[in-house]
């Protein structure tokens, strides 16, 4: 039986990342947040669409992810919505990411943010950017699968 701590509640999903990138591998990381940020995340006020992950000075950082200011807090105690946030990962994982990003020219993109128990986690994907013809192939393949499913239904 699952513990209360093991429950996963998805907050937001970056569906556009799977369209723009071919995801080769995924990683889970914790996110270092302020109190008002956690409250906004619980309210679901997060946008991952423009975000990306960089490795600076041996630390993974989440850049350009918008977490809206907490509405019930005063302006003085609130946070900057697009501030750089540190990701909490093991050094071994970070060194693996550094090697793959630098050698193969891959990109790190946030895929989804979720609560795992009471901790905010983020799933990041190591991906290669898709070209226009790759995107068209994916759309065509999905449309063909829908057509086949409709034909089988009849």
UniProtKB/Swiss-Prot annotation:
For the region Disordered, what residue ranges are annotated? 135-154
**Which Gene Ontology terms cover its molecular function?**
RNA binding
Q: Biological process GO annotation list? A: trans-translation
Q: What is its main location?
A: cytoplasm
Q: What residue ranges carry the coiled-coil annotation?
A: none
Q: Which UniProt keywords apply?
A: Cytoplasm, RNA-binding
Query: Where does the protein end up?
Result: Cytoplasm
Q: Does the keyword DNA repair apply?
A: no
Query: From what superkingdom does this record's organism come?
Result: Bacteria
Q: Which GO terms describe its cellular component?
A: cytosol
The record, for InterPro entries, names:
SmpB, SsrA-bd_prot, SsrA-bd_prot_CS
What is the protein's known function? Required for rescue of stalled ribosomes mediated by trans-translation. Binds to transfer-messenger RNA (tmRNA), required for stable association of tmRNA with ribosomes. tmRNA and SmpB together mimic tRNA shape, replacing the anticodon stem-loop with SmpB. tmRNA is encoded by the ssrA gene; the 2 termini fold to resemble tRNA(Ala) and it encodes a 'tag peptide', a short internal open reading frame. During trans-translation Ala-aminoacylated tmRNA acts like a tRNA, entering the A-site of stalled ribosomes, displacing the stalled mRNA.
Q: Which family does it belong to?
A: Belongs to the SmpB family.
Q: What PANTHER family does the record tag this protein with?
A: SSRA-BINDING PROTEIN, TMRNA-BINDING COMPONENT OF TRANS-TRANSLATION TAGGING COMPLEX
- This one is known as SsrA-binding protein
Q: What is the lineage of its organism?
A: Bacteria, Bacillati, Cyanobacteriota, Cyanophyceae, Oscillatoriophycideae
UniProt gene name: smpB
